[in-house]
Amino acid sequence: ASDVYKRQLLKRPALNTESLFDTVRSIIDKVRAEGDKAVLEYEATFDKVTLSSLAVTPEEIRVAETLVSDKLKAAISLAKQNIETFHSAQRFVGKKVETMNGVTCWQKAVGIEKVGLYIPGGTAPLFSTVLMLAVPAKIAGCKEIILCTPPDKEGNIHPAILFAAQLAGVSKIFKAGGVQAIAAMAYGTESVPKVYKIFGPGNQYVTAAKQLVSLRDVAIDMPAGPSEVEVLADASANPAFVAADLLSQAEHGVDSQAMLITTSEKLQTEVMAEVERQLAELPRREIASRSLENSKLILVRNIDEALELTNAYAPEHLIVETENYMEVAERVTNAGSVFLGALTPESAGDYASGTNHTLPTNGYAKAYSGVSLDSFIRKITFQEILPEGIKTIGPAIEEMAANEHLDAHKNAVTIRLKAINK
């Protein structure tokens, strides 16, 4: 197949945030100018809720805890523990390196002091995302972890979101959604502290808002688009499992994309039948069936061709259900998170295995990693130069600076060499 055809085949549904920029910019500007007042007004307009204040009270958190079932509390606690275990293993230990005699360099990892987490409202309460963002932030040593999430029409936040936030160590929770929440965290209001970096998924308005505030005022985790999965399978795959994986992606939202790349025509046919059968039983079948319109089933000649397409597509989630899946996995170079073998559904990583589910979409997996402990830290470099060190590297610095016509740079070394050579 030609490269042009392959590109067409892997084309994603277009996400156009440009057209939203004017609307989004005007909301950001108003929040920046008017603070809480503007946020409360937008909550009334967009979330149809009249709030007297934005902050969630300790009493609300206490009540929420009583409303979450013991079974769900136990599940959330198990997930938290696994996310903690996996992200703690990512801790950076910087060792001192003597690059030359008398020249020592090292790095120190420091948590970003203030981070803002955005948890969307929408059609599902994403308490799992609270864990995915707050747990690594806590391990990283972020001093202030604030969370914004839209309330329902009664002004309440889903109890599981409050429970997960409390469990994971969030410092402050605010009732604010959409663009107004992103603006509040980017610029600060009377209630909401200004943060240094904003994390979390959202619709195209939230994505556009994150893009705009990141241009000059605050860092963001990564550009985000609709969620996506690719299943790479051969004849050994279980068609019911593959169909279940495609549907679990499709129920996220109407713009989600699910794709099957397989070497087996028989599997392709069986998966199509299974998708129909399972879809009929899903409560969110309306959303899932609309999202399946963006989906593709691609038949390839061999695993090499499957991998070529996979690495060109760079899926957010990649499920490898083949006979020798470890060998296939070794050859994956572009993907957000990879799920190996018949018993590893994407849902495991979405919730409780320990890996992070905040991942690059829209082909960004070619250049971006998913959220990890590193997302919440900065590495500061240090260096110390002793007399024998400046004597050794000084002449090289002088020579380089002179050739770049930066005489003051050269002089900063010369003046020191003179002083120690007296």
Predicted regions and their residues:
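Conserved small-residue-rich beta-alpha loop and adjacent elements
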Residues: V97-F163
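A glycine- and small/hydrophobic-rich beta-loop-beta segment
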Residues: H252, L260-A335
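Conserved NAD(P)+-binding/catalytic subdomain of aldehyde/semialdehyde dehydrogenases
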Residues: G169-Q257
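N-terminal Rossmann NAD(P)-binding subdomain characteristic of aldehyde/semialdehyde dehydrogenases
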Residues: V49-L126
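Short, small-residue-biased leader/transition segments that mark boundaries at the very start
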Residues: A1-Y5
